């Protein structure tokens, strides 16, 4: 339940509007509310980090509004809370009116939801399930440069799960669509909430089965097999993509060194 911010309130401040985050000096604000001109605003506590509250404030600032990507180097737990705040702020902003009857809605006091007092419909934040998979062939890993990555970063394959599809089917389909190959021996590794804009990444490792690389030019600039000790520029630490790549490299080292 949200409340009015008081002078001595302190903690981490996720000030967000339209999927942007307020980052004075390029950092997530931490300290007393008075130091950031937040007294009198409404805030919702969305978690705790190292014993300190993390607050969401739905507000646009004139300056220093940026992407949550800018704080990706934070500790994973704090980054995830910042992402939670950005997603919740957008959820509340985009669900002011009921999609069924058009009446104004109000936030629940017991959970992250919006309620319609007219037709009693209940809305929750949208979460888009995605798969991400590291594919190994002997001492090499399949890495691709995506069209959205113009900085030379190479990463593993990923994509959204479609309606009526299992996670395993999504892996097989996405890999075939983007690279033209088949995989086998799929193994679940971990998951990571990813606020771009509201994804839940479900991470797998797989082995190459058959086929030659034929990329989808709408998705990829290039894709290739890279030996574990000769890799291109990789995603930053803390991302699930980097975790998958490092796990694959560790497996290759154990087998080939």
Curated annotation (Swiss-Prot):
Its cofactor is Mg(2+); Mn(2+); Zn(2+). Residues 125-248 form the Nudix hydrolase domain. Its EC number is 3.6.1.-, 3.6.1.22. This is NAD-capped RNA hydrolase NudC. Zn(2+) binds at residues 98, 101, 116, 119. It is an enzyme of class 3 (hydrolase). It holds the Pfam family NUDIX. A divalent metal cation 3 binds at residues 174, 178, 219. mRNA decapping enzyme that specifically removes the nicotinamide adenine dinucleotide (NAD) cap from a subset of mRNAs by hydrolyzing the diphosphate linkage to produce nicotinamide mononucleotide (NMN) and 5' monophosphate mRNA. The NAD-cap is present at the 5'-end of some mRNAs and stabilizes RNA against 5'-processing. Has preference for mRNAs with a 5'-end purine. Catalyzes the hydrolysis of a broad range of dinucleotide pyrophosphates. It comes from the Bacteria. Substrate binds at residues 25, 69, 111, 124, 192-199, 241. PANTHER family: NAD-CAPPED RNA HYDROLASE NUDT12, NUDIX HYDROLASE, NUDC SUBFAMILY. Keywords: Hydrolase, Magnesium, Manganese, Metal-binding, NAD, Zinc. GO terms for molecular function: magnesium ion binding; manganese ion binding; NAD+ diphosphatase activity; NADH pyrophosphatase activity; RNA NAD-cap (NMN-forming) hydrolase activity; zinc ion binding.
């Amino acid at each position: 339940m949200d409340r009015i911010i008081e002078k001595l309130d302190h903690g981490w401040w996720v000030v967000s509007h339209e999927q942007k985050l307020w980052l004075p000096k390029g950092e997530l604000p931490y300290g007393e509310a008075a130091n950031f001109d937040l007294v009198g605003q409404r805030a919702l506590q969305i978690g705790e980090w190292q014993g300190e509250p993390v607050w969401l404030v739905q507000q646009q600032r004139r300056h220093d509004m940026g992407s949550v990507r800018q704080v990706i180097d934070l500790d994973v737990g704090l980054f995830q809370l910042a992402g939670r705040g950005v997603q919740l702020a957008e959820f509340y902003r985009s669900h002011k009116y009921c999609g069924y009857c058009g009446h104004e809605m109000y936030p629940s006091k017991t959970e992250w939801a919006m309620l319609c007092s007219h037709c009693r419909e209940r809305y929750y934040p949208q979460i888009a399930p995605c798969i991400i998979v590291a594919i190994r062939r002997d001492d090499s890993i399949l890495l691709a440069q995506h069209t959205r990555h113009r900085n030379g970063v190479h990463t593993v394959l990923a994509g959204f799960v479609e309606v009526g599809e299992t996670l395993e089917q999504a892996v097989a389909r996405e890999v075939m669509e983007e690279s033209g190959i088949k995989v086998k021996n799929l193994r679940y590794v971990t998951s990571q909430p990813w606020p771009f804009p509201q994804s839940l990444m479900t991470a797998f490792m797989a082995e190459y089965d058959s086929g030659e690389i034929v990329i989808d030019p709408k998705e990829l600039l290039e894709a290739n097999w890279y030996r574990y000790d000769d890799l291109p520029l990789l995603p930053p630490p803390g991302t699930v993509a980097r975790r998958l790549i490092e796990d694959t490299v560790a497996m290759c080292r154990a087998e080939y060194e």
